[in-house]
């Protein structure tokens, strides 16, 4: 449907939540908003080719204004994964393969989005962009990413953007690292993200990441056990 339809639907549901629920707590509506909302800008890979930090920040600001007008206060953007495998189908959503450039662009995206009171969410934390066989949705990281490569390449953009622009959110990915699901990893979600990087926002799991702890990684016997592991990880 049209954006007007989306706006009307969000308004109706929000009104119901505020006026007809016991506590009257507003709902939080989120959307990807990767490269624009009503105004469509170039794909992230195209934006990165400009090296124009001011223009990239402005594109994020405009997208946030438009999304906010529809009642959306939460974006699943920016995506600061590093593209290292050309077979991977989400390369176009990345800013390329250079960690420093990705961190710089991610910082500007967060600044632009959050300047309008809309939450930015860094994704996908972490080591999401090298799935086995380059097949998106595959929960196994392949090839094995060594610790030095992990920290100097894949985690660098997350660390820098968090310290430079303080995004409100981080999305935990559904893949593993060294045999441990990232979304159930205390090392990734607490020791690195909060204690070392200083992140103080919320963590949201990627689609089915909690379920996959049981169904694909097989490190939990039940879904309830998977939920427990994820919550205790951070």
Regions found by a protein language model. Give the residues of each.
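Glycoside hydrolase catalytic-domain context in secreted enzymes
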Residues: 1-234
